[in-house]
Amino acid sequence: MRARDVTVASVRARIVVQVSKRRLTFFRRGRRVLTTTVAVGSSATPTPTGSYYVNQRLIPSDSGGPFGPGAIGISAYSNVLTGWTQGGPIAIHGTNEPWSIGRAVSNGCIRVRNPVLRKLFASTPAGTPVVILR
């Protein structure tokens, strides 16, 4: 690979998820823009901790389905759900179960309220860092 074939871009946003507090914070240019309560993985299917990045976006055909209006795929994979592709990709997504927000009930994904998902979807390009803390 030649240097002239590569474009380097900086990302000015980041997401930090605190699993134990069930909280997601979105930062832009080092400033906190949004803090919200989230649903996280259950004890049987925990949300994996570590440093990841946004790698895809999904807009389902049915915005009333389990992902709500969309999903932000991140580079994390479940260590428990081995039956899914490559161990179960993890995402930040909306929900059709708003009662679940604030609980440890997901299969490892991070659920947010649908209006929050829309804001994040518009503000987190591919490569955005996502740090998931215990």
Placement of each model-derived feature along the sequence:
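Exported/periplasmic cell-wall-interacting domains
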Residues: 4-14, 34, 42-51, 58-134
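Short, surface-exposed polybasic-aromatic patches that bind anionic ligands, especially phosphate groups
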Residues: 1
